[in-house]
Regions:
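Oxidoreductase and adenylate-handling cofactor-binding alpha/beta cores
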Residues: 108-127, 166-170, 297-304, 309
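Rossmann-like adenosine-cofactor binding region
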Residues: 59-62, 171-173, 177-270
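Phosphate-coordination loops involved in phosphoryl transfer and adenosine-cofactor binding
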Residues: 1, 70, 145-148, 217, ...
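N-terminal glycine-/charge-rich "phosphate-binding" loop or analogous flexible N-terminal tail
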Residues: 1-50, 169, 306, 322-330
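Glycine-rich NAD(P)-binding loop of Rossmann-like domains
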Residues: 102, 125-160, 187, 323
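Phosphate/diphosphate ligand-binding glycine-rich loop within oxidoreductases
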Residues: 49-126
Length: 330
């Protein structure tokens, strides 16, 4: 079976670590260094049974049809934003991602850090230091105790955030239309009700056509005056123009963003001018431990697929029966 790896400049070093680990496992992948936006020669995919690609690669139906042997598309990260899930399922192709526990823990810890930083006015403090202004006469920090936290998305990371904060004397609310077995102590609400009643809102949803600009101007207006918005999930979940307007008008007290609609965040983005926003370059939660675990899981997932086993991190679960039948027929 053939394994093709597809990396771009920002991910090449990480993919080289995966390549070396695959080779140690007895798998010899073909590693293609790709420039985002460029077409991939059909010949490069002709013998691919498994395609290991960076998550925002545009893996369209056309790309998948160019690989007649293709059984699976694998992202070593959580994100599979660029993969056409519907087409993959229709073609009997498994879509697999990587989310080891180390990644979940790192993202949850980092989210709590962002919540605390925004609550305690760290962005304002940095702005004061950089501008040379005097220390404010009145504190901007507010205790987290006694606040209401709204968690949008109760997947692994959202649940871990809730678990980390369970004993912090805060009220936990959540919105997730697909949630099952909601942990004790969390009140499940419709999104608009959560926004109206939460002091801090943190996003943990996947980016789909349905969730793009989930937080738009209308929903920002629903949020409490002086509320805080946290996003460590996907930039496209928030309408950044509407967010700038909500913050510059004073409606929101603060925000902390690790992800953006365009990455890296353009230097002329108006968000950069706000003194009460914490911006980080899509690196929050990425630890040495999680990076090593992502490599190990990518190798394990590829190995499982090559042996005819669907990994636990299968994203399009409805493909399972078709996929196993395709495997049995070869």
């Amino acid at each position: 079976m053939g394994v093709v790896m597809l990396s771009e400049s920002g991910t090449a070093a990480f993919f080289e670590r995966i390549e070396a680990a695959l080779q140690r496992a007895g798998i010899a992948p073909v590693h293609i260094r790709h420039t985002a936006g460029d077409a991939i020669p059909a010949s490069a995919l002709a013998d691919a049974d498994v395609l290991l690609a960076y998550g925002h690669f545009r893996c369209t139906e056309e790309v998948m049809r160019a690989a007649p042997r293709l059984r699976a598309v694998v992202s070593p990260w959580v994100g599979t934003d660029g993969f056409d899930m519907e087409a993959a399922t229709r073609l009997g192709i498994a879509v697999v991602n990587g989310q080891p526990d180390e990644h979940t823990q790192g993202m949850a810890e980092a989210t709590v850090m962002m919540i605390l930083a925004a609550s305690y006015g760290l962005p304002q403090a940095r702005h004061t230091m950089e501008s040379g202004a005097a220390r404010p006469a009145e504190p901007v920090a507010e205790l987290l105790a006694g606040k209401t936290l709204g968690i949008v998305g109760l997947g692994q990371i959202g649940r871990r955030v809730a678990a980390l904060l369970a004993n912090w004397d805060i009220t936990l609310k959540a919105h997730d239309p697909f949630a099952r077995d909601v942990p004790d102590g969390i009140e499940l609400l419709p999104l608009d009700d959560l926004l109206r009643t939460s002091d801090i809102v943190t996003l943990h949803m996947l980016l789909t056509e349905q969730t793009r600009h989930l937080i738009d101007a209308t929903r920002l207006r629903l949020m409490k005056p002086d509320a805080i918005l946290i996003n460590t999930a996907r930039g496209g979940l928030i309408d950044e123009t509407a967010l700038f307007q909500a913050m510059s008008s004073g409606h929101l007290r603060g925000a902390a963003l690790d992800v953006f609609e365009t990455e890296p965040l353009p230097m002329d983005s108006p968000l950069r001018r706000l003194p009460n926003i914490l911006l980080t370059p899509h690196m929050i939660g990425q630890t040495k431990q999680s990076r090593a675990a992502l490599v190990d899981l990518a190798v394990a997932n590829v190995g499982a697929l090559m042996s005819g086993t669907l990994p636990k991190t299968l994203r399009n679960r409805t493909v399972a029966e078709t996929w196993l039948r395709r495997w049995a027929d070869t």
